[in-house]
């Protein structure tokens, strides 16, 4: 798994597993809504009244309808390094 996906995959998996409704905003401004049925390295399958395959490179933002409890299982890649001078 690529280092850049260590946060993305657990987040999307929590949305899928808990069937949390999401709004997905595309880079062209279009808003899609539904539930994440599945995803891989390149696409997200979004389910609503129809299934839509959305390419990740076209996505700007994923907004859950409610808070998500996800645990990455990775070492805190979102935390500052120990050498940071705060």
Swiss-Prot record:
One of its GO terms (cellular component) is cytosol. The keyword RNA-binding applies. It holds the Pfam family Hfq. It comes from the Bacteria. Belongs to the Hfq family. PROSITE patterns: SM. The lineage of its organism: Bacteria, Pseudomonadati, Pseudomonadota, Gammaproteobacteria, Vibrionales. NCBIfam families: Hfq, PRK00395.1. RNA chaperone that binds small regulatory RNA (sRNAs) and mRNAs to facilitate mRNA translational regulation in response to envelope stress, environmental stress and changes in metabolite concentrations. Also binds with high specificity to tRNAs. Homohexamer. Residues 65-86 are annotated as: Disordered. This is RNA-binding protein Hfq. The keyword Translocase does not apply. Residues 9-68 form the Sm domain. GO terms for biological process: regulation of DNA-templated transcription; regulation of RNA stability; regulation of translation, ncRNA-mediated. Residues 71-86 have a biased composition (Basic and acidic residues). GO terms for molecular function: RNA binding. It comes from Vibrio vulnificus (strain YJ016). Keywords: RNA-binding, Stress response.
């Amino acid at each position: 798994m690529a280092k850049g996906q260590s946060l993305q995959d657990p987040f999307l998996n929590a949305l899928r597993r808990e069937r949390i409704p999401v709004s997905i905003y595309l880079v062209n401004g279009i808003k899609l809504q539904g539930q994440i049925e599945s995803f891989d390295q390149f696409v997200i399958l979004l389910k609503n009244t129809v299934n839509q395959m959305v390419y990740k490179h076209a996505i700007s933002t994923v907004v859950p309808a409610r808070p998500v409890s996800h645990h990455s299982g990775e070492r805190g890649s979102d935390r500052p390094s120990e050498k940071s001078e705060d």
